[in-house]
A protein has these predicted regions:
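Catalytic, metal-anchored helix/loop core of enzyme active sites in primary metabolism
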Residues: 1-176
Length: 176
């Protein structure tokens, strides 16, 4: 075993890492919530998805990402891959992880502890934020970013769509 430390860069995993920072480990974790914007089709009936084009799928409402990740986001595949990654990265059984839709992409992950408290990591949907944290870890470095306007901030959450749960079931099976 080495003293090597893995510092995640992906926004959700970096958020979990930050929420766990200062804790003695994961033994007091009750659950971890990983958020998903849901992509451009989250409110579209599943039967309508057979008519979407690649161009439609590449129009992510919040994030600027490469084509593959944007398509994976539109299909919710990326969230399932993130579930698998989080399970192994944080060495917790998949049952600890919940996936929820958060269309605004402001809350990146939530760690809830056994005492009922929750720590949320939030920032504008900008990959420079988790990358800067990963590069500096202990000493935060200044970057240009869009401030959150808390007086006009609306946060909403919804359950992972049941008509799209098959992909999540597969991801959970892979974790076991």
């Amino acid at each position: 075993m080495t003293d090597t430390k893995i510092i995640p860069i992906d926004s959700e995993h970096n958020a979990i890492f930050q929420c766990l920072s200062g804790e003695k480990g994961t033994e007091d974790v009750k659950s971890i919530t990983i958020t998903a914007s849901g992509g451009p089709f989250i409110n579209a009936p599943i039967q309508d998805l057979q008519h979407v084009t690649v161009e439609d799928a590449l129009k992510h409402p919040n994030w600027k990402m490469g084509s593959k990740v944007t398509i994976d986001s539109a299909t919710l595949v990326n969230k399932c891959l993130e579930l698998i990654e989080a399970r192994y990265l944080f060495d917790l059984d998949e049952k600890y992880f919940d996936l929820v839709i958060h269309p605004q992409s402001i809350i990146h992950s939530i760690v809830t502890y056994i005492d009922g408290s929750s720590i949320w990591q939030m920032s504008s949907p900008d990959m420079r934020v988790p990358i800067a944290h990963a590069l500096s870890e202990v000493n935060r470095i200044p970057i240009e970013f869009k401030d959150l306007d808390f007086s006009n901030l609306n946060l909403s959450f919804q359950e992972f769509p049941s008509d799209r749960s098959k992909i999540q079931d597969i991801a959970r099976e892979v974790c076991n």
